[in-house]
Amino acid sequence: MDCLEGMKYIDDKSIDIVLSDIPYGINYDDWDVLHTNTNSALMGQSPAMKQTTFKKRSKPINGWNKADKRISYEYYSWCRQWCKELFRITKEASPILLFSSKRYLHRVCCALEDEGFLIRDILIWQKDRCHAKAQRINNVLHKRKIYDDIYNDYRIGNLAPMYEPIIWAMKPYSHTLTDCVLENKIGGFYGQNGIIPSNIFNCPINIKNKYHPTEKPLQLIKDLIKTFSIDNNHIILDMFIGSGTTAIACINTNRNYIGFEIEKRYFKIAKNRINKHILDNNLQDKYSLIV
């Protein structure tokens, strides 16, 4: 189900925590295309460009044009739609934890702010490894019969992406954070052994059976839940649940969850994965099987 439709059925001020790995809007796959750009020079797939020859990458072949510049704004506009619903259904001081791309992080933050949320921090997921892509420019220059030692090991592309940002936003509160903690047990974070936790979460990728191309480590999601949730009765919402990792993390930490997934193939994967986890651990009394 599309979360924009599904969230309409959620009561006002009923969600304690939002934790979601949102689409990044960088044309990673069909489900990550959130713009209407039909520029044939763009190596990203638009819903209006269904040709099989249309390559799935997020940069133009021969420079940017005016249509390309609208991509990030259209992504921002899309984010505002679900941010508006989040503001309605979350409680005062509810933490909003959203994975985001470095490229469009600012657009998500602006969408959250423009719908009323406060930005608290940018948390960091520090990886143990990554897949880096950067082309040696000599590979291109030599085809043009240009040879110059100055370009040895000079590259085009991105630096090795060893981290991913996680936006920590919060719904404003009318009294004090202490009141929010006493009323709903939200508004703060949980430290261990008297130590204030860092905003850098070190977690190896370590995903043995990968169900989704952008799947996050289960341990990382559990760590985020245990940092911001201290009540087993908390309801955690994931608007883009993908293969169901957030649901599994909620079950493993004895929390309640609500999730939405618009892609049928991933909904089926998530359903089977969650149901198997519930049955394997004899948790049918607490968690309902997905039909």
Task: Specify the residue positions occupied by each region the protein language model found.
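Core catalytic lobe of class I
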Residues: 1-279, 285, 291
